[in-house]
């Protein structure tokens, strides 16, 4: 086994050579399909269109849209000619998008009509007016991928019409300038107290990470992935789009996660693979119409992105029938996968570990104070090194130095350990520790204890400042439909399981949690609902994917 030295363009060419007439993409909503050969033709047309509009290698393209074939076409077209893509969260509002454009230096912006109540056209019109006076800081080209046009935008069809202006020689020259080590994408990480950081990933990073993760999962060109996670997120980009690009498998695109839509898509398209954060899987199995759908085609997938109760793996294997489910650990800075269990690993391994490192991935656990490796079974910081580690943070050399040491090790900020079998275990984020009266309290430990109580659907613990003790623990609890939980009874339950100083100061009950587009609990929205705003703790929750 060796690492690939192929660009995105070469990956697409290889897939087309083998599976030209096989379906590459299906849009679940529109039912539109593209074969691999048709996808290649669309990508080439848009790439030529970008060149005709004056974009060149190194210019940055933003994509602001929900999952769609146009999203994929524009991304691959940009990658072919060395234009890095800034993947934009479709929930961003006007001010956030403006800040993001200034932060990343986006020169052109592809956009759709909007997402739910977030209407993009109004924002694009505002942005285009500001852009004329800020040519160095804001996009100068706006490309509509949807049905609506902004005031100063060109449509994707108009862009493709200009592609004939680019000769074959000029197009080939642009392609030949692209290297596997060139910047492919800038992925924005979320932060609770500061501007987000732009993680720079190369074509080499993402292609090889996807290839090795897909191999561990056992993906072939016969597989069909139900793509229910956002493409703007590294999990969706690598484990879905680039799984397809390195194996020739088929993608079924959903523009938004909705449990019933996912159930329908799996049944109709006979999907064999589904990836997601724990919430996606648990919501699916709890849907009132779950038993009405035939999900027998589902075979394997990846669960990542957040901690989960061990029983969830049992349910995924027995209720969903996904015997090949794997657990993956990583973060955006690692392209994103570092470790992954095997599809045929014993349930005990899947319940409690995050598996072994992918091939060519180095891992170690170090003592936080000395920086030296710790023995088997001892907690320390998880560090990783190899082909998958990011190029750095965009325009943030100081932040890059904090994350990457002189020997190339990425310090993940996660605490874990390795067992005697070589499996890694995730414990908690370094910043998911609350110090109450001098005592260190693991928020994960509290969440896991509460999760054992009957009727609890999900939990989120966080720290708040305390004038007396430094910090106190607050817990939000989502109650399962049909259940009622009494606070006094729950406190009695916790007193039998946790030391007195670990008992939360406040327990808050919800019927539903706010979630990010990736399916994770939206911690900042939750804090705002409880009246605490941003806590002194940075809970980025970059556990995986």
What is each PLM-predicted segment?
Residues 33-37, 184-208:
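Conserved AMP-binding A3 loop
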Residues 81-158, 481:
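Structural core segment of the AMP-binding/adenylate-forming
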Residues 92-99, 111, 274, 386, ...:
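AMP-binding/adenylate-forming catalytic core of the ANL superfamily
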Residues 140, 145, 499-521, 539-544:
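AMP-binding/adenylate-forming catalytic domain of the ANL superfamily
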Residues 161, 271-276, 285-349, 362:
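Gly/Ser/Thr-rich phosphate-binding loop
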Residues 207-224, 232-273, 287:
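Conserved AMP-binding/adenylation subdomain of ANL enzymes
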């Amino acid at each position: 086994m060796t690492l690939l030295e192929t660009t995105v363009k070469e990956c697409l060419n290889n897939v087309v050579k083998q599976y030209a007439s096989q379906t590459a993409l299906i849009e679940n909503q529109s039912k539109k399909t593209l074969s691999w050969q048709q996808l290649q033709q669309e990508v080439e047309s848009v790439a030529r269109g970008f060149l005709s509009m004056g974009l060149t290698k190194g210019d940055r393209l933003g994509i602001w849209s929900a999952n769609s074939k146009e999203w994929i076409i524009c991304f691959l077209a940009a990658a072919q000619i060395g234009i890095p893509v800034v993947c934009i969260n479709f929930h961003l509002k006007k001010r956030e998008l403006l800040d993001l454009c200034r932060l990343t230096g986006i020169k052109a912006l592809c956009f759709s009509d909007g997402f739910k109540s977030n209407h993009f056209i109004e924002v694009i019109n505002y942005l285009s007016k500001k852009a004329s006076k800020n040519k160095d800081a804001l996009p100068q080209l706006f490309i509509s991928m949807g049905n609506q046009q902004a005031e100063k935008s060109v449509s994707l069809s108009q862009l493709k019409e200009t592609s004939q202006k680019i000769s074959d020689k000029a197009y080939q020259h642009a392609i030949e300038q692209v290297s596997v080590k060139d910047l492919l994408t800038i992925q924005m990480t979320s932060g609770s107290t500061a501007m987000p950081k732009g993680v720079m990933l190369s074509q080499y990073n993402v292609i090889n990470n996807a290839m090795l993760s897909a191999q561990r999962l056992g993906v072939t060109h016969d597989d069909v992935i139900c793509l229910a996670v956002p493409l703007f997120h590294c999990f969706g980009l690598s484990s879905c789009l680039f799984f397809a690009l390195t194996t020739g498998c088929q993608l079924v695109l959903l523009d938004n996660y909705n449990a019933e839509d996912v159930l329908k898509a799996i049944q109709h398209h006979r999907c064999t693979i589904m990836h997601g954060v724990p919430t996606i899987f648990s919501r699916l199995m709890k849907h009132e119409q779950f038993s009405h759908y035939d999900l027998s085609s589902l075979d394997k997938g990846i669960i990542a992105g957040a901690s989960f109760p061990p029983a969830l793996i049992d349910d995924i294997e027995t209720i969903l029938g996904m015997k090949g489910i794997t657990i993956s650990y990583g973060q955006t800075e690692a392209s994103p996968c570092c470790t992954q269990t095997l599809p045929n690993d014993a349930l005990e391994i899947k319940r409690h570990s995050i598996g072994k490192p992918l091939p060519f991935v180095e891992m170690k656990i170090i003592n936080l104070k000395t920086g030296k490796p710790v023995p088997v079974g001892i907690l320390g910081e998880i560090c990783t090194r190899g082909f998958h580690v990011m190029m750095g943070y965009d325009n943030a050399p100081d932040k890059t130095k904090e994350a990457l040491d002189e020997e190339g090790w990425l310090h993940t900020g996660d605490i874990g350990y390795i067992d005697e079998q070589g499996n890694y275990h995730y414990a908690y984020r370094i910043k998911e520790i609350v110090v109450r009266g001098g005592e260190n309290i693991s928020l994960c430990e509290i969440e896991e204890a509460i999760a054992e109580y009957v009727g609890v659907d999900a939990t989120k613990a966080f720290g708040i400042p305390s004038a007396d003790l430094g910090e106190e623990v607050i817990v939000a609890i989502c109650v399962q439909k049909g259940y009622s939980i009494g606070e006094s009874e729950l406190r009695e339950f916790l007193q039998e399981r946790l030391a007195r100083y670990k008992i939360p100061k406040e327990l808050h009950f919800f019927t539903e949690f706010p979630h990010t587009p990736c399916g994770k609990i939206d911690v900042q929205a939750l804090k705002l609902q409880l009246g605490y705003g941003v806590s002194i703790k940075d809970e980025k929750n970059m556990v995986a994917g």
